[in-house]
Structure formats: C-alpha cells, structure tokens
Amino acid sequence: MTNNFTPAKAGQQSKRLSKEEYAEKMKAEKEAVYQMADDTAKAIVSDPEKFKAFLDTQSRLDRYSAVNALLIFKQLPEASQLKNFDDWSKDNVKIQKGAKSISILEPVEYAKKDGTTGISYNVKKVFDVSQTNGKRPPAPTVNRDPKALITVMLDSSPVEVEATNELPYPNMAAFYNNEEQTLYVKRDVGDSVAVAQCVAQELGHAQLSINSDSYSRADMGFQAVCIGYMLCKKYGVDTQNFAINRIPEKLAGKEPKDIRYELSNTRNAMADIHSRVSDELYKKKQERSKDYER
C-alpha cells in the first residue's frame, strides 16, 4: 500500500522575493496607503460628523502630519500613543495577540543623482497603546482656566496685541487685522470662554497669514475656525461655538491632494501656535516653581 499524502505545511513557506519583487511590493503598499489617505480626505469633507471626529484625532495627535492623522483616523481614530513593534518591545510592552498594525508614512532622506538630499516616504507599521498590555498614558494636564489661557495665548502671540473698545464685528471678542499685523482684543468682555475661543481662532488667522505667501480672511476663515476648535479642544475649553459643521462647498469639491494640502496648512498653523503656548506654559510653570523655592 502506498501512502499518498501531502505534508500539512507544503507550499506554506513564503517565497523569498527578489530585490525587484520586494521593491514592487513596497511600491504597491505605499500606493495603497496614499489611496487610503485620499479616500479618507474626501470622506471627511463630505460628512460634518466625520470631519469633527478627524479634528479631534488631529488635535490629540498634533505631532503627526495631516496625512498621517487621516491614516490614523481611518484605522484607529481613538489612538493616543503610537510606536512600532521594536519600540514597544524596548519598553517591555507586548502587543496584544491579533492586533492589527496601523500604517502611516515615515519620511526618509536619500541622495539624488545630483548629490542633493531628497525626501521620500516609506510605510511604517505602528500600534497604539490600547493594542498592548501597557498602561494608557494619563491625559495631559491642560490649563482649563480660560482667563489664564487667554493670557498665555496673547503672551505667545506671533503678532502685536492691542486692547480696544470696538471691533469691526460687534459679536467678536478679538480680531486679527492683517494689514496692521495686529491682534485686537476687546476690553471688558465678561465671558472668558468666548474670549478664549475668539483669541484662538484669530491667532489661527494670524498664523495662516505668517505661513502663507498670500492671505485672504474670507478664503482662510474655515481653516481659522478649525484651528480655534483644535486649540480649545486641546486646552479643555468648550468648543460648541465653533461652526466646524459648515464645511465650505469649495473645500468639499476639491481633489483629494488639494484637501490634504489645506488640512496640512491648518495642522501646521495649529502646531505652531500650540508649540509657543506650550513653551509659555512651561516658562510660567518654572517661574512659579522658583517662587515656591524662595
């Protein structure tokens, strides 16, 4: 009798890819990731609820680019701390069995033929802390006192700040005048939350102007609203007054790459403001510590 059988693992060994095949595989993977970012960009500008949720993700993960925020939002919107497998292992943290990695893009430098340095992007696989046996990091301590936050935002403003009794729009507590490169803040506004919201939004206008070759208040109005929303979300200030549900038709009708470009400009301006505010908060904290030591 002949024992005709097939070994259980026959054919299961993965074929070693040639250099060309590996490059083709990596190219296809990168194209799929970019397609995911494009599809997500179109999806969020077509749905106010998704757009709001995306801003929440970007606000929480402000160090990540807009493209990576889109990718994270699509794969695990509640993510809070991301590392690759090796970095989690270095911290003696294990990935949960069956956890699906999150694909993001990582910049890498390469030498061009002319000798200059170029930037390319590779797909990087990461995992969130919620996919591990590690403890979630405590929520960052933020200054939730609107009055104190207003002071810090104004002290770290990239443009001149002046108090005034009147503004072009009576219902506003602050207004950025681009021609004068000045942020005007209305005196004697009793609602400190409203002032904090307005200052955050108008700082958005100021930063967008600084970061752009040309500036139009009308064209950049929605971006400034998004910046104000993300800053207030990050600092624990009420965000209900921000009209982020009014997504401009012009934005919704753009091509994915143009949507990503606008989201990148918005994120970069927010990150610039947040960086200065964080530095100012740290400086004030150090000053308080010195006072306690005296």
Feature-to-residue mapping (PLM):
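N-terminal accessory/interface modules of nucleic-acid-binding and processing proteins
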Residues: 2-294
